[in-house]
From Swiss-Prot:
It is found in: Cell inner membrane. The lineage of its organism: Bacteria, Pseudomonadati, Pseudomonadota, Gammaproteobacteria, Pseudomonadales. This is UDP-2,3-diacylglucosamine hydrolase. Its cofactor is Mn(2+). The gene is lpxH. Its EC number is 3.6.1.54. SUPFAM superfamilies: Metallo-dependent phosphatases (SSF56300). Substrate binds at residues 78-79, 121, 159, 163, 166, 194. GO terms for biological process: lipid A biosynthetic process. It holds the Pfam family Metallophos. It comes from Pseudomonas fluorescens (strain Pf0-1).
Length: 248
C-alpha cells in the first residue's frame, strides 16, 4: 500500500494539522511501503539552516517513520521550494523532481505539485521561473536569516492577496496542459496537489481512458490518496479532537 498527501502547510499556528499528520505517521503510514508528499508540506521554508524547533520535530517524526521501513518521498511546492538535501538527509526522505514518473503496481504514474500546470496565471509563472532559477536559489539561501524571514512573509501575503483577486479559472490548472504533459510523459494517470480542489477526473486522451487525481489540502480535514492492488482511493478524514484537559 502506498500513501500520497500534499498541501499540509504545516506551521506552529495549526497544531490540529500537525497532530493529524503525526497520527498518520504513527498509524496508517506504518503499514505503507511508501509515503509521497507532493509539495507545500510546510507553510514556509526559508532554508535548511534555519530550522525551528517545530520543524525539527517534524523532521524527527519523518526519520522515525523512515527508520521503521516506510520509504518517504518529498516534492517541492510553491511554499517550500527551498527545502534542501540537508533536511532530506536528516528526515530520511528522498527529494523528488517535479515532475516525476513512478511505478505504482506496474503502472507508470506522473507526480507533480501542480503549480506549473496553472499556465494562465502569467504573473505567478514568471515569479516561479525566477525563484526556481539555480542562481536565484543560491542568492536566497545566502541572504541573512532576518531578510529571508521578511521576504517569506511578503511573498505569502502577496500570494494570498493575488489569489483572492484572480478569477478561479486562472488559479486552477490550464485544461490543455493536462493531456499535453500526460502524453509527453506517456502516462494514463496524473496525481498532483496545489489547487486545493480534491477530485478524481476521468479523461480521454486520444483513444485511451485516463485520469487526473487532485489531492486535497489539509485545513478542516485531512486528505490522503491510497494506492494498492485494487487501484486509487482518494478520501478525506477528520482530525482527532484535541485532548481534554483534566479539571481540578
Amino acid at each position: 500500500m502506498i500513501l500520497l498527501i500534499s498541501d499540509l502547510h504545516l506551521e506552529e499556528e495549526r497544531p490540529d494539522i500537525t497532530r493529524a499528520f503525526l497520527d498518520l505517521l504513527a498509524g496508517r503510514a506504518r503499514s505503507a511501503s511508501a509515503l509521497y508528499i507532493l509539495g507545500d508540506f510546510f507553510e514556509a521554508w526559508i532554508g535548511d539552516d534555519a530550522m525551528t524547533p517545530f520543524q525539527r520535530s517534524i523532521c524527527q517524526a519523518l526519520r522515525e517513520l523512515s527508520d521503521s521501513g516506510t520509504a518517504i518521498f518529498l516534492m517541492h511546492g510553491n511554499r517550500d521550494f527551498m527545502l534542501g538535501k540537508a533536511f532530506c538527509k536528516q528526515a530520511g526522505c528522498t527529494l523528488l523532481k517535479d515532475p516525476s514518473v513512478v511505478q505504482f503496481y506496474g503502472e507508470p504514474v506522473l507526480l507533480m505539485h501542480g503549480d506549473s500546470l496553472c499556465t494562465r496565471d502569467e504573473s505567478y509563472m514568471k515569479l516561479r521561473r525566477y525563484l526556481r532559477n539555480p542562481l536565484s536559489l543560491f542568492i536566497l539561501r545566502n541572504l541573512p536569516l532576518r531578510t529571508r524571514h521578511k521576504l517569506a512573509r511578503k511573498l505569502r501575503s502577496e500570494s494570498r492577496a493575488q489569489t483572492r483577486m484572480k478569477a478561479n479559472d486562472i488559479v486552477d490548472v490550464t485544461p490543455e496542459e493536462i493531456p499535453r504533459i500526460m502524453q509527453e510523459y506517456g502516462v494514463k494517470t496524473l496525481v498532483h496537489g496545489h489547487t486545493h480542489r480534491p477530485a478524481i477526473h476521468k479523461l480521454q486522451i486520444g483513444d485511451q481512458a485516463a485520469k487526473r487525481i487532485v489531492l486535497g489540502d489539509w485545513d478542516r480535514q485531512g486528505w490522503a490518496l491510497q494506492v494498492d492492488e485494487n487501484g486509487f482511493a482518494l478520501a478525506p478524514f477528520d482530525f482527532a479532537p484535541p485532548l481534554a484537559l483534566p479539571h481540578g
